[in-house]
Amino acid sequence: MMGEFIIYYRGKVVGGIYDGFASLLNHPKSLVRNRVIYILAANAQWDDENRFDAILNDYLAHVIDEKPITARQCIKALAQVGKAKTQYIPRIIDYLHSADLSKYKDSMRPLIEQDIAETEKALTLYEKANS
């Protein structure tokens, strides 16, 4: 059906309305955003219609989420998105390079920087493997 596809979580169908689910990326509670980020990344591999294209900008915005834990979850999940959608890798890497991390406390910034480095490394490997 147009505008729908199945959302799987831990091997079980948990939803079918992609647009409504993706709108939760902007939920006020960070726990909800964390789960949506994780589930969307896990389901990117089944996105044959490239519907992730429509949400990529909103998804990438969470690289600098107001909550550092959500930012870290997003950055780590981007490796899974890039593996499933290799056409996004250059854009993801560019976004990670340009991310302004100055708003995060000194205690969190190094962790986020490490996550970015690990994700970039994984994405670069996926890109080389698919060239």
List each model region and its residues.
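Alpha-helical scaffold domains
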Residues: 1-131
